[in-house]
Amino acid sequence: KSAEQSIDGAHLRDNESLYKVYDDSGVETMYLTVSRGNKSEGTDHSWSEINQYSVDDYAAMRTNRYQVNGLLQVGDEQGPVSGELGYGEKAPNATVQVRGQSSSLNKQKNYKIELKSGKGKWRGQRTIALNKHMGEGLRFRNKMAYDLIRGIDQMMGLRTQFVHLYVKDETSGSNSFDDYGLYTQVEQ
């Protein structure tokens, strides 16, 4: 039997190179077009339906959270930009659902956008969590905390980015993007 190794004196270190790949100091702009999918993928719902229910409602209904199809495109304030995720695409590249527990009770929701396999990644990520932070008046403390954690030895942080989200709800017949405001994207 080998001797047990002690972790006393071992130091946890974050990988600083992960934070140097992208500039997270500004605001990214995302355009999300939502549409009704199909029953086999569980995306046969409207945008209104997925925003209507809380985690408690789903528990009472004994069903998984509703999802819709989504086409996620990254750009600037003028629209999607060539070379960025989803540019020029017409078919959905993601599924979208409300995320969070108690936050699912808020009027403005947090979203989980899951990019479909083979449809690309955004900053190396297929799961994009967008948090609204409705209970936090300034709405920047969460990002600030993660940014500060980067500089503390033996603490692991997550990459974060402010995101300005625009949503076009094709499930209601809309043909234009509505401004959903500022979100914080947190690495999953």
Regions found by a protein language model. Name each.
Residues 2-188:
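Phosphate-handling architecture centered on phosphoinositide signaling
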